[in-house]
Amino acid sequence: MNSPQLAFVGATAITPFDEILDSAVVLEGNRIVFVGPRRSLPTDPTTRTVDLSGKFIAPGFIDIHIHGGAGSDFMDATRADFETVCRYHANGGTTSLLATTATAPLPEILAALRTVREVQQNPVSGAQVLGAHIEGPYLSMAKRGCHLKEFVRNPQKAEWEQLLEFEKEIKHITLAPEIPGALELMRDWSRRGINISGGHTDSTYSEMMRAVDAGMAHATHMYCAMSTVARPHPPHREGGCVETVLERDELTTELIADGRHLPAELLRLTVRSKGIERVCVVTDAMRGAGMPDGIYTFGPKHGQKTEVKNGEALMLDHSSFASSVVTMDVMVRNVVSLMRLSRREAVAMATINPARFLKIADRKGSLEMGKDADCVILDEGFHVLETVIAGVRVPKLSYEPRATNR
């Protein structure tokens, strides 16, 4: 027997390929079965109708770089902590995400990957965990940011083969292309279909291009913990990671558009250089998201101590940021206000672009017939009113901040 249909009518639907005024988006079970003008909606007396006049409906947001929220971090590696993060970020319109790890001893990273596997097999409530993003420990010491220096290291095949016990769960890895062993890992993992990203890197243009040849196709949190033009062989200059990403069409990238990490001109420069279709927005949120101002660790509970204050996560000396404390809806609003892009373009950077990056655009990332019933309903100011995940309506979710994990 088919599931009862649920029709959201009257909203402006941002697919994001089009904006459909006075739209109808119909869900049946966990699939979208109709998207179009309300006037074209077939009459069915059994369909439950929800009037969204004056509102917007868009695909659910997909966050490919997120560490935590509401006091929990994916490195805490428990089902309860995963659920806390996923429930919290569903409040911001995120319907699916990559659980992102941090630099730590190997057993702790493996524990997080084990929980990713468990949660994929038996999902928690809130945003769907699509897999894992390995960020660290294979980073540049000079560009490690808030990752603990005592655990930063070069790739060793004996170690990464243990990580590959979770090959099906790992969808993405960030590493510094210039460190010993990085290119070998890139060649191996890219052949397995894992997305390779350069990040936390002090690489030169020539080192970046060798990484592109080895399978790298993305750059993590543009401008952040990333090399720029320098004189590696004085007096001659050479571009760094920033210039390589801006110049090379084969590289995609991501922006932390929280209004804190990057000024508007750098956000606009990235899209002007790369084009909308090659840029995703990400939160890179840490456990302090949604929590009171105070001291919180980044990554594992023994990780780098950071201060959350006035909507920012900072290193204790306030010398740099330590991830963000925002949700995806904030990013989308900032793309419109700071980057001067359309609502449709902003939604694309949070939906279809990350879906294409993850090679799941056949089932996620847009409002189209046959795709997963993941939607976000927004008011006229683009604030989240309700999230729909796999056809289940989840209004603003309650959650218990896990303050003991500070």
How should these model regions be labeled?
Residues 11, 297, 356, 366-402, ...:
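C-terminal cap of metal-dependent C-N hydrolases
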Residues 237-255, 271-283, 288-371, 375-377:
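His/Asp/Glu-enriched, well-ordered alpha-helical/loop segment
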Residues 54, 89, 134, 189, ...:
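Conserved, mostly hydrophobic/aromatic
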Residues 164-293:
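Active-site core of metal-dependent hydrolases
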Residues 87-98, 141-167, 210-252, 292-322:
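Active-site gating loops and adjacent loop-to-helix segments of metal-dependent hydrolytic enzymes
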Residues 55-111:
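Metal-associated gating/positioning segment near the N- to mid-region
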